[in-house]
């Protein structure tokens, strides 16, 4: 289950209903998928063949298609990151820059962990959303954020897009408050 940490205040928000309510107040979609549907051999695997990626997509076909129909997503894929990923540190440097997108950034975590650091409203400031398997998040178009891995440096996620070109980040320059 996701855990939120508000950087300004140190407040920690836990529990599915509390997390969903907080994220909803910030315009961020949060859902939870039943990760027990995923075959056991894929639950802790971070180097995936194309066949295994397709198996994950097939497992969550109904959830993906439902989310796509509700939010206008047209294409999806699997991203798998771990210490076995070539150039992982370079990729993380790219991901760890505060940026925006011209569409939602959607991730459904199927294995491992990741953190989205998201700019909330003026009162809230930046907050961390620690995600684990089963957590689904959609950071709205134009909302400053970045993503990084947790200490285990492993994640597998379904990514959904409107634009078939996939993940395209645009730099964001902080005008008033730094990411603390």
Swiss-Prot record:
Catalytic activity reads: 1,2-dihydroxy-5-(methylsulfanyl)pent-1-en-3-one + O2 = 3-(methylsulfanyl)propanoate + CO + formate + 2 H(+); 1,2-dihydroxy-5-(methylsulfanyl)pent-1-en-3-one + O2 = 4-methylsulfanyl-2-oxobutanoate + formate + 2 H(+)
**Enzyme class of the recorded protein, top EC level:** oxidoreductase
Is-annotated flag, keyword Metal-binding? yes
Q: Site May play a role in transmitting local conformational changes: list residues.
A: 104
EC no.?
1.13.11.54, 1.13.11.53
Where along this sequence does the record place binding of Fe(2+)?
Answer: 99, 101, 105, 145
According to its UniProt record, in which pathway does this protein act? Answer: Amino-acid biosynthesis; L-methionine biosynthesis via salvage pathway; L-methionine from S-methyl-5-thio-alpha-D-ribose 1-phosphate: step 5/6
Q: Which molecular function GO terms apply here?
A: acireductone dioxygenase (Ni2+-requiring) activity; acireductone dioxygenase [iron(II)-requiring] activity; iron ion binding; nickel cation binding
Name the Gene3D superfamilies for this protein.
Jelly Rolls
Q: Could you say which cofactors this protein requires?
A: Fe(2+); Ni(2+)
The entry's free-text remark on the cofactor is: Binds 1 Fe(2+) cation per monomer. Binds 1 nickel ion per monomer.
Q: Which residues bind Ni(2+)?
A: 99, 101, 105, 145
Sequence similarity? Belongs to the acireductone dioxygenase (ARD) family.
Please give the function described in this protein's UniProt entry.
Catalyzes 2 different reactions between oxygen and the acireductone 1,2-dihydroxy-3-keto-5-methylthiopentene (DHK-MTPene) depending upon the metal bound in the active site. Fe-containing acireductone dioxygenase (Fe-ARD) produces formate and 2-keto-4-methylthiobutyrate (KMTB), the alpha-ketoacid precursor of methionine in the methionine recycle pathway. Ni-containing acireductone dioxygenase (Ni-ARD) produces methylthiopropionate, carbon monoxide and formate, and does not lie on the methionine recycle pathway.
The annotated subunit structure for this chain is: Monomer.
In Swiss-Prot or TrEMBL terms, this protein is called Acireductone dioxygenase
Instruction: Supply the gene name.
Output: mtnD
């Amino acid at each position: 289950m996701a855990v939120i940490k508000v950087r300004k205040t140190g407040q920690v928000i836990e529990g599915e209903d509390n997390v969903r309510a907080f994220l909803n107040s910030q315009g961020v979609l949060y859902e939870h998928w039943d990760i027990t549907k995923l075959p056991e051999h894929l639950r802790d695997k971070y180097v995936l063949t194309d066949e295994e990626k397709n198996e994950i997509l097939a497992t969550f076909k109904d959830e993906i298609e439902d989310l796509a129909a509700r939010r206008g997503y047209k294409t999806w894929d699997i991203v798998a990151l771990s210490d076995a990923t070539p150039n992982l540190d370079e990729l993380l440097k790219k991901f760890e820059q505060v940026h925006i997108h011209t569409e939602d950034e959607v991730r459904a975590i199927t294995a491992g962990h990741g953190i989205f650091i998201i700019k909330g409203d003026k009162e809230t400031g930046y907050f961390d959303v620690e995600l684990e398997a089963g957590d689904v998040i959609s950071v709205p178009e134009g909302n400053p954020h970045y993503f990084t891995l947790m200490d285990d440096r492993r994640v597998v996620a379904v990514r959904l897009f409107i634009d078939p070109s996939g993940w395209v980040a645009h730099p964001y320059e902080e005008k008033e408050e730094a990411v603390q």
